[in-house]
Regions:
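Core SAM-dependent methyltransferase catalytic element
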Residues: 202-222
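Conserved alpha-helix/loop element of class I SAM-dependent methyltransferases that forms part
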Residues: 25-44
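Class I SAM-dependent methyltransferase SAM/SAH-binding core
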Residues: 48, 56-106
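A conserved beta-strand element that flanks and buttresses the S-adenosyl-L-methionine
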Residues: 118
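N-terminal, positively charged/glycine-rich alpha-helical extensions of SAM-dependent methyltransferases
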Residues: 1-18
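Conserved beta-strand signature within the Rossmann-like core of class I S-adenosyl-L-methionine
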Residues: 143-150
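A short glycine-rich, Lys/Arg-flanked "PGG" loop and its adjoining helix->strand segment in the class I
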Residues: 131-142
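C-terminal alpha-helical "lid/dimerization" subdomain adjacent to the S-adenosyl-L-methionine
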Residues: 151-199, 205-207
């Protein structure tokens, strides 16, 4: 199946509300678990989540690791609003968590570099994937941990629809539509490997970790 682009920014309030209200606890918790398994002992320093959406992974990382500073970057103001509303009630995280509105490349970040750069479900939104792979070495310090999880494109439209019904059959139609569009906009694992080689990141590992997710992990040179 050929890739079908989708909008890069979820800037409609209803779309953001549907996404923020959906149950992504299982994949988001799995993302945090992948981070902890790939980088055992990583409990201090600064982490940035690129394309953080409503901030669930940002908040999970900060809750699990009290010595971490965690920043979330997204270009959707409605999405960030839902994250900020949750943070407002989490007094123990305030001062360690910050949400930033901005777009890659060139976003104005609170820190010059980060000890870890993570991203979940941003890659498939990007019309030009090199935006992500160029930004990670610019944002992460030498030797920084890198963890990117995203959907991968199924072999056919029928397979994509089956995945939607399996994992989001009970969700609102708006969310099911967006999920299908995201699957169709995602990259195949080998396409991601080609992207990494083109940006000097061929040492990063690419693996499939579910029936719909791929994982890129490793450290920046240095």
């Amino acid at each position: 199946m050929q890739r079908i682009l989708e909008p890069e920014i979820m800037d409609e309030f209803e779309q953001a509300r549907a996404y923020a209200g959906a149950d992504f606890a299982e994949p988001n918790e799995r993302f945090v678990s992948h981070f902890e398994k790939k980088f055992p002992g990583f409990g201090h320093g600064a982490v940035i989540d690129l394309g953080c959406g409503p901030g669930d992974i940002v908040l999970r990382l900060a809750q699990r690791h009290p010595a971490l500073t965690v920043h979330g970057l997204d270009d959707s103001r409605p999405m960030l609003g839902f994250g900020a509303a949750r943070l407002w009630d989490m007094h123990e995280l305030q001062g360690r968590v910050q949400f930033i509105e901005g777009i890659l490349p060139g976003a104005q970040l609170p820190l010059l570099c980060y000890d870890a750069v993570v991203s979940n479900s941003l890659l498939h939104h990007l019309h030009d994937p090199s935006v992500l792979w160029r930004s990670i070495p610019e944002i992460g310090r030498p030797g920084a941990a890198v963890l990117v999880m995203d959907l991968f494109r199924p072999v056919s439209a029928a397979a994509a629809r089956e995945i939607v019904e399996t994992h989001a059959g009970g969700e609102p139609e708006l969310l099911k539509r967006d999920f299908l569009n995201s699957l169709c906009a995602a990259f195949e694992p080998e396409e991601v490997r080609v992207q990494l080689r083109a940006h000097g990141l061929a040492h990063l590992e690419v693996e499939t970790v579910s029936d719909r997710h791929l994982l890129v992990s490793g450290r920046l040179p240095g």
